[in-house]
Structures are given as structure tokens and as C-alpha cells.
Design a protein with these regions (language model features):
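C-terminal "exit" segments of structured domains
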Residues: 53-132, 137-140, 144-145, 151-157, ...
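Short, compositionally biased P/S/T/A/G/V-rich stretches that sit at domain boundaries
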Residues: 80-88, 166-199, 279-280
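Contiguous beta-strand segments within globular domains
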Residues: 85-103, 191-212
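Surface-exposed, short loops/turns at beta-strand junctions within beta-sandwich domains
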Residues: 145-148, 246-253
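Edge beta-strands of extracellular beta-sandwich domains
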Residues: 162-170, 265-279
Length: 280
């Protein structure tokens, strides 16, 4: 899986695009990514479950923190991407008690601010114990240990292309999602990965493997994180970590999310980062 793409556009000297932005925005408001980001980068990152983070040329030496921390944080608890015209946008997501540490990687092409709020509503203090806060021209990367459970919030202020991804170190994992079809020799039939594309508006069988208990449901989401449709997957009677059920994809592009509750009753969610594509 390709996890990170650093856009080359972020390493170029600002041109008229950035100059137009600066004429509208407060003085000193940085705008990394001098030209429009190549959509090929964005699509490749989305398809593989990776992300685009825009670094200025002067920040290249500090970009390694994203890959170093990414190796430690394998579970996606939240992700969204899109384009912010102007203003701000808030994102909320649950953090459960199984999470040992979190990695926030938020990139916004023309960043005014990126703010992280704890469940209490207090802003995350960069100097707090266990917090490694890294700020860039076009975003923020924060690694923190032992986050308190509850609903966290990220607010981005600015404009342009954005990716907001939150990953965790946790034993609860949605580690496999696959569309399958019935096959095998007579008397030895079973489900195998589909060899044909996923089809739009047709019934197909979906399997998911979850490490962890307390699963309450599955759903499809789009690239922006909005729910598209609920999914009725049932646990295998012989293996409570395996789930399967018929699915009729009603949207062309989607991701799969599992939701549940931990042993203390806190809600959790895990996102399978790969973007699925359904063809007519």
C-alpha cells in the first residue's frame, strides 16, 4: 500500500496562484503548492489508501517524521479529503481506550490554522507531555501517546486541497476487506477473491476481517468521510473476527468502515483505507 505522496508542486516557487491568494488572505498566510496539485497524485493516494501532504522546499528535511510515525500507526480511525473553498471545516471522530497513540497528519494547501480539540473541548497543547507537534507551511503533523477516549475534533482554516488523516496504534484493526465469489471443485466450494471488477447496483458478497470484539456494524463512506449506506455483515459462527454478507454498491467510489464499542463502552471506528471502485 502506498501510504504517502509528497506533492512536487509544494516544492516550487510560488507563482501567480499564490500571489492571487496572498492578495485575498491575511499577510504572511502561507500557501504551499504553488500550482494546482496534479490530480494524478491525489487519485493515486486515494486509490491506495495513502495521502498527499504538501511540504514547502525548505521543509523537506522535516518531512521524514510522517513516514517514521506512520510505520508505528497502522490503524486508520479517520480520513477525509477534498477542496476547501474558503473558511473553515470541522471533523469529529471517536477515540477508544484500546488506542495507545495517535498520529494526526493534516495538510491544507493554503493553511491559516489547524487546531486539534480534546474531548473536553480544550485545544491540544503542543507542550503537553507525550505530544510531538510539527507545524508546516501547509499543515500539521502531531504524534501523541495515551490520548483520552471520547470524541476528538480537528478544525482546518484556509483554502485549497486538503487531506486529514488520523491513524492509531491499537489492537482493534480492520485488517482485510474483500469482495468474494463462490468457486472451487464440486463438494469443495468456497468463497475466493473476485477476479472481476466490483459492479455497481448488483448484489455481491463482501468479507471483512476484524481484530477486536464489540463490533456493532459496518458502513460505506465516500472520500469525504460521509456515510453512503449501511452494510449488513454477519459474524462467522466459527470465527467471530470474520464477517460476511451481500452488498449492493450504490455508489461508484467508496471505503468500508467498521464500528463497535470497546470493553469500557467507548465507541470505536476503523477505516479500511483503500478506495474501492464499482463499475456499471
Amino acid at each position: 500500500m502506498l501510504r504517502y505522496l509528497v506533492s512536487a508542486m509544494a516544492l516550487l516557487t510560488p507563482n501567480s496562484f499564490a500571489q492571487q491568494q496572498s492578495s485575498q488572505n491575511p499577510p504572511g498566510w502561507p500557501c504551499a503548492g504553488a500550482r494546482a496539485v496534479d490530480p494524478t497524485y491525489v487519485q493515486l493516494a486515494e486509490n491506495t489508501g495513502g495521502e498527499v501532504f504538501l511540504f514547502d522546499r525548505s521543509e523537506s528535511a522535516r518531512s521524514l517524521v510522517l513516514m517514521q510515525e506512520g510505520m508505528k500507526h497502522k490503524e486508520t480511525v479517520f480520513r477525509t479529503s477534498g477542496t476547501l473553498a474558503r473558511g473553515y471545516r470541522d471533523f469529529q471522530f471517536p477515540v477508544d481506550t484500546t488506542i495507545e497513540s495517535l498520529l494526526f497528519s493534516i495538510s491544507l494547501q493554503c493553511t491559516q490554522s489547524v487546531v486539534i480539540y480534546r474531548p473536553s473541548g480544550a485545544e491540544l497543547d503542543a507542550s503537553a507531555p507525550g505530544v510531538d507537534d510539527n507545524r508546516y507551511h501547509a499543515g500539521r503533523i502531531v504524534a501523541m501517546s495515551r490520548p483520552e477516549p471520547g470524541v476528538w475534533q480537528v478544525r482546518i482554516v484556509g483554502s485549497g486541497l486538503f487531506f486529514a488523516v488520523v491513524e492509531a496504534k491499537s489492537d482493534v484493526s480492520l485488517h482485510s476487506v474483500r469482495f468474494v465469489q463462490l468457486g472451487g471443485r464440486p463438494g469443495h466450494e468456497g468463497y475466493f477473491p473476485m477476479t472481476t471488477p466490483v459492479r455497481l447496483n448488483l448484489p455481491q458478497m463482501l468479507q471483512a476481517s476484524v481484530s477486536g470484539s464489540g463490533v456493532t456494524g459496518f458502513r460505506m463512506i465516500n472520500s469525504g468521510g460521509a456515510t453512503l449506506q449501511p452494510l449488513a455483515l454477519a459474524a462467522d459462527e466459527n470465527d467471530q473476527e470474520e464477517f460476511q454478507g451481500p452488498v449492493i454498491p450504490s455508489h461508484k467510489d467508496f471505503r468500508i468502515v467498521v464500528e463497535g464499542r470497546d470493553s469500557r463502552g467507548y465507541p470505536y471506528q476503523r477505516i479500511f483505507p483503500r478506495l474501492f471502485h464499482a463499475e456499471p
